[in-house]
Amino acid sequence: MKAQPPLRLTSQAMAFVLAGGRGSRLKELTDRRAKPAVYFGGKARIIDFALSNAMNSGIRKMAIATQYKAHSLIRHIQRGWNFFREERNEYLDILPASQRVDEHKWYLGTADAVTQNIDIVDSYDIKYVIILAGDHVYKMDYEIMLRQHCETGADVTIGCLTVPRMEATAFGVMHVDASLRITDFLEKPADPPGIPGDEGNALASMGIYVFDWAFLRDLLIRDAEDPNSSHDFGHDLIPAIVRNGKAMAHRFSDSCVMTGLETEPYWRDVGTIDAFWQANIDLTDFTPKLDLYDREWPIWTYSQIVPPAKFIHDSERRRGMAISSLVSGDCIVSGSEIRSSLLFTGCRTHSYSSLSHVVALPHVTVNRKADLTNCVLDRGVVIPEGLVIGQEPEEDARWFRRSEGGIVLVTQDMLDARARALG
């Protein structure tokens, strides 16, 4: 009799994705959409990375908790992630903050988002829950993390990575012993502690938590009854488990998915204009830090039915071309030069225009003789003829959002205000 392959732990797990955050450090990019719905990489949205990791790891039961300006996110999930089938015991539920438990309460914190949906998680009939942040870019096999969680008998297993100590103020930071048991956990400390023997770096939480559902369910109910709790995983639940239970760290390097192109584990919190621009521009490198061409670990997303990109005109100074760039479908590069840039679906660049190190979100139009450098163009922006961006910092800052790193964010509202002021 042929031996049966061992059952994957992910078949007994669900992914609960926290996707309600605004991402205020992205400024006007999140005025109309939640951070997980922000575009990334030419085709995808940021949330697609967490969902694709779950899908590729073998998880077929997922829930997405939404709150801030969720319409574009919900529409994206409905269009791009509609292939789950109940008859195959597959589920993907969208859980808006609908005040379904208490008519006066939205989601009060990350833990409360799960608490308010305990009945839905119960209906999945699962043993493990993986809590995921929906706003990070990375590739990871959650099966490996689940296996460690079971082998160590932990109450919670937390995904972690090494970051420079002074960058760790935006993360939960942990101390671990030789067995990777967490002995202390500080949420977003002003002065992060370093790793013993490596004081310049800190061990930071990725916002990925693995629990046995029975344990987490009981913990959530008790937390909901605590008037002093902020009902947040990082502030309340995780520190309590570290003090009173068994919390283990899981190093991202043990489960990150890498191809021959990638030389080190890749994880990005694209939470600022500079970080968002850099992570997208990195994809144009000859050897990108993140390999989106990995067919064994695809990034699933909604794919519009559009024609291929088109390049037209071939005369001196009016040659439609793109060098070291990513150009998505339905783009027309007409007599313009694109260098080290990323164009999302449906962009148009007209004659004699020049783009260098530009991230253009869908349906951007760049009119004739525009000269753009080091900028992010929001969806639907129409760049007027002859506009120059990226060469005069004071002029850029007068009309647009100029970041600390010198990246210029351009929205249509900013362009309209400029046009009114200039008459």
Swiss-Prot record:
The keyword ATP-binding applies. GO terms for biological process: glycogen biosynthetic process. Pfam families: Hexapep_GlmU, NTP_transferase. The keyword Ligase does not apply. Its EC number is 2.7.7.27. Alpha-D-glucose 1-phosphate binds at residues 107, 172, 187-188, 205. Pathway: Glycan biosynthesis; glycogen biosynthesis. Belongs to the bacterial/plant glucose-1-phosphate adenylyltransferase family. Involved in the biosynthesis of ADP-glucose, a building block required for the elongation reactions to produce glycogen. Catalyzes the reaction between ATP and alpha-D-glucose 1-phosphate (G1P) to produce pyrophosphate and ADP-Glc. Homotetramer. This is Glucose-1-phosphate adenylyltransferase. It comes from Cereibacter sphaeroides (strain ATCC 17025 / ATH 2.4.3).
